[in-house]
């Protein structure tokens, strides 16, 4: 009896040994087929629907803060070409500047679903301002402000003189009175700024810091518009590209991230672009814009897409649906340049 049990046990062990290589082989075959299917799917061109689902609108709300002794004492929207501070204010809300561009959802790795909320857009970022340059800007702005106060005082003298000698309260009188009231308020604002500048010293080492808040707008398959907060995780000064990622590091539902392969797409011939109408024109830009597919022609990585049909950041595809790059001005930023940006991602 014992011998029979021993023989049965031995036979079972031999059978299991035969099955183990088969199981490994089957697992290997399934894994290999899965990899082949995934690579083939990755190389599969985008459909028109997927092209539209790969884009979103990026809204950048930016402003500058003047920080002195660790405290923010002044806000302004931008720095003009003549170094003037644009819309300086004691309140942040009155100097926020909003710019729009097209963003493209992307995978970090070509053959792996690795988007995790990553988006690439084109947006110029100004250089950082060192402390010495900051003090120079402050001194120049102080001089401009004092000059503006003198101009406003002269204007108000003339306006008040007109109001005194023309005391008939007709339509013309009311218009001038309202204008004088606006100038009086502007003078009061400039005087408050002058008092602030008078309290500042170079020894206080004031700083000018740029702040930016990014929001991505995208549409669900049913057309409903959604928005999600983004953070900057990388940028390229040369290409003026910015790599963004959702705060939660998750890919929104309904979007179709693009994979950026290792070989650049074609540089000449007919192509397709996905653009938001009006987004490339400051007066028409809005987060409510809808995207469309527009034909274009490439010549040495340059396109002929009008800005009113597709602004910076619009993705360009071959007529077969393969991703080529994104627009910046009348140029196309290539896949290799976009891959370089993904390599610069800052790790949390």
Please annotate each region the language model reported.
Residues 55-204, 313-317, 323-331:
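Catalytic histidine site
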Residues 1-13:
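N-terminal intrinsically disordered, acidic low-complexity segments at the extreme N-terminus
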Residues 50-58, 96-101, 106-109, 114, ...:
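Extracytoplasmic
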Residues 43, 98, 223-225, 231, ...:
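Flexible, gly/ser-rich surface segments that form the specificity/activation loops bordering the active-site cleft
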Residues 11-32:
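N-terminal Sec-pathway targeting helices
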Residues 110-123, 178, 182-268:
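Conserved active-site neighborhood of the chymotrypsin/trypsin-like protease fold
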Residues 35-48:
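Membrane-interface motif at the C-terminal end of an N-terminal transmembrane signal
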Residues 77-86, 289-299, 348:
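Short, positively charged
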């Amino acid at each position: 009896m014992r011998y029979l049990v021993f023989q049965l046990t031995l036979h079972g062990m031999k059978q299991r040994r035969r099955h183990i290589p088969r199981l490994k082989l089957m697992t290997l075959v399934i894994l290999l087929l899965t990899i082949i299917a995934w690579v083939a799917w990755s190389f599969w061109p985008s459909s028109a629907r997927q092209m539209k689902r790969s884009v979103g609108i990026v809204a950048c709300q930016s402003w500058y803060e003047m920080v002195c002794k660790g405290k923010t004492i002044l806000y302004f929207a931008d720095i003009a070409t003549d170094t003037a501070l644009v819309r300086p204010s004691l309140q942040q809300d009155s100097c926020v500047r909003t710019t729009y561009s097209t963003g493209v959802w992307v995978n970090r790795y070509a053959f792996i679903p690795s988007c995790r909320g990553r988006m690439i857009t084109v947006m110029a970022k100004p250089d950082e301002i060192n402390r010495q340059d900051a003090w120079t800007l402050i001194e120049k702005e102080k001089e401009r402000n004092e000059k503006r106060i003198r101009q406003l005082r002269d204007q108000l003298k003339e306006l008040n003189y007109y109001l005194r000698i023309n005391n008939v309260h007709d339509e013309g009188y009311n218009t001038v009175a309202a204008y004088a009231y606006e100038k009086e308020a502007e003078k009061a604002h400039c005087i408050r700024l002058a008092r602030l500048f008078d309290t500042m010293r170079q020894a206080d080492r004031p700083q000018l810091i740029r702040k930016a808040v990014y929001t991505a707008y995208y549409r669900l398959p049913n057309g409903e518009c959604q928005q999600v907060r983004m953070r900057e995780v990388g940028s390229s000064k040369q290409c003026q590209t910015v790599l963004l990622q959702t705060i939660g590091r998750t890919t929104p539902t309904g979007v179709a991230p693009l994979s950026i392969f290792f070989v650049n797409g074609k540089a000449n011939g007919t192509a397709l672009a996905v653009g938001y109408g009006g987004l490339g024109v400051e007066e028409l830009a809005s987060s409510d814009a809808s995207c469309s597919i527009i034909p274009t022609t490439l010549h040495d990585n340059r396109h002929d897409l009008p800005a009113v049909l597709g602004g910076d950041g619009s993705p360009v595809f071959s007529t077969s649906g393969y991703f080529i790059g994104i627009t910046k001005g009348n140029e196309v930023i290539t896949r290799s340049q976009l891959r370089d940006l993904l390599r610069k991602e800052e790790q949390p």
